[in-house]
């Protein structure tokens, strides 16, 4: 989900249910770095990430700025600091990472090209990151190249390797990220987007109310509510919070209707 358009409780459930699902298939998986393809950020994330055991984060989405992007700030690393004071070591959208000329969806980091790297060097960024997550199935990537054709001698590493083996691994630059530094743009959808937002918020409120009522009933008279039913309610709500439900609500789904209709 985009995170800036749903409740804090929903963000927590997205992590809780998502981590549980992944561990049902990969029991030994570790969750170390939060990095996303789309602009799925909000100011309170450092606190939530820390509670789920994450150590690092990235504020970059250089090839998916349709739905938004973070404000440019800082150099190689920052301590992304939430309103409550919780911080997490983060690779930001650098102060020198500009919006790509003649593009409405990219920053200059998307292709790790020479002008971007030179701008990073001028800003004393020793280990610039040029990254772009791509949807599974795209035929024309990876954009930075592969095999013997990798642009500017780029090196592919995981975020964990970058933070722990390549970067300095620490910084004194505390970035107190306000919600206003999340520059958002849900430009497709108009009236249907308003309806989606209203229905999602109504469902968020009703699910939490149902859980509270169930707890009170259990304490009062031993009533045992159906956890599986509530889990299914959260599952379908979380699908409605998927970023594509908001950014492209009129897109078709395998000739089975649109995101909005489902």
Where do the protein language model's features map onto the residues?
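Catalytic-domain carbohydrate-binding cleft regions of carbohydrate-active enzymes
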Residues: 1-262
